[in-house]
Each structure stands twice: as C-alpha cells, then as structure tokens.
Amino acid sequence: MPNLRIVSDNAVSRAATLVASTTAGGLAAANLARDTKSNVHRATGTSVTYTLTWVAAEPIGCVALPFCNLSPTATMRVRAYASNGTTVLYDSGAGLACPAPALRPLGFTAAQAASAYAYGGGACARRWFSQVNAFKLVIDIVDTNNLQGYVEAACLVVGATWSPKYNASATSVSVIDRTEISRSAAGDQLADPGTISRKVPVDLRAMPEADRARFLDMVRNSRAYPVLLSVFPEDADLALERDFTIYGRRTKDSDIAYQFLGAYATTLEIEEI
C-alpha cells in the first residue's frame, strides 16, 4: 500500500491559460481555478477536454478534480508535454477517473447526489503518476453514463506530490454536520439542515530529517492555501481511498516535535473547503 500523498502547491493558479473544449453558458473553465465548490465549470455534454499551459515548467505528479459529478465508469486521460507543446512527457491512457461511486445523501436522488458537493455528495477524480516537469497539460474526460447528462467540476488540482518515508501512524475521518437542532414552544424537536463536510487528521511519527524539512516548508505556507491529501492513494479498497481523500485547508498550526535520534513527529489536520 502506498504511503499518504500530499499536493500542497496547486499549479493551476499559475497557469497562463486554462481552456475547456466546451462550456455551458456562464459556467466557465476559470471556475476550476477557484478554491470553492459552489462555482463550477460545466461542459455541454458527457465529455470534455481541459488544456492548461505554463510559461515555466511545472513539476506535476497528480491531477485531481476533488468535486465533480462523474460516474464510476468515467475515464480520464492525462497527457503532459514539454516546452514545444508537442513532445509527450507522460500519457496515462484512458483509465477510470473515480471508480468509487459518489455518496448519496438522504433526500437526494442519485442524479442530484452527483453534484451535492455541499452535502457530502459528488465524486473525486484523481490520477497519480511519476513526476514530470511540464509546460502543457491535456486532460480528457469521457463519462457516457453520467446521470446528469454533462460533465461538471468545481476545482482542478495539479501539482507535485510529497509522500513521507513512513506512513501515518494514525488517522480518522470526521463528518461535520452543521444542522441546527432546536425546540419549538410546544416542545417539539426541530432540525434546520446544514451543510456537511469532512475533516481528516493524520499523525506522522518517526519522520527522518528530510521529511521534517519538507513538511516544515509546506506548513510555512499560509493556511489560506488548500492542500490535497490522500491517506490511502490507489488503495484496492476504493471506498477507503475515496473517504480519506480530501481537498481543504489546515485547521490549525502543526508543531514538529523532536523524538529521538533524528526522528520527528507532527500532526496534520485538513478540513474540506
């Protein structure tokens, strides 16, 4: 089982161009560069191609759409190019984008749940690969079984990955339900449904010096910048991978403690955007 992986620097924010092959109305591709799940890009049909370019080479080892309406049979193909825009550095071929089905919150139809990002619905498409330094990226998505009849995504994450030498010693996932419970004057219990999101903390123990330095570089960045965390990347248990993959912000500062003989420990906690 691979160790956890983190993308802490989203290269989409530095892209010179971000273009979608088709766009429905005003739901523009530029929304993919926003760190929100309420602003989406929507294609006109069940396939779309995203093309990104950069002025300088970007290290890339992951492409993810953490909030999308793709079905379990949707495919994603990622191609990375050199500076001339024609030399292929990496080609994933067409593979399943998010084989674990989207969760279906109570009260939603299957089609509605596919894009119920604020209530625990939606899917997370991802592709992990050996890092390349690319000037251009092309992402092809095909989802002929899409329940809504079009491809939709709220965020695009592209960047280098970091994985510690030793995996997390402990982790959990919390479902944060903002429903408010109250009582009426007649004594009845009332519920005002709220949004739902997740929080995933991970404990890292016995980090060697190289991991300590890399982790410290990461947390020196403001908590304003979201990170993509996958505790069980490419795991055979697809639901486990889905449930412990999260795109969000650090909820608190991370102390790095010296343990013994050059080994360090810390805790990282991410709450979904």
Where are these regions (language model features)?
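Extracellular/virion structural assembly segments
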Residues: 1-48, 55-273
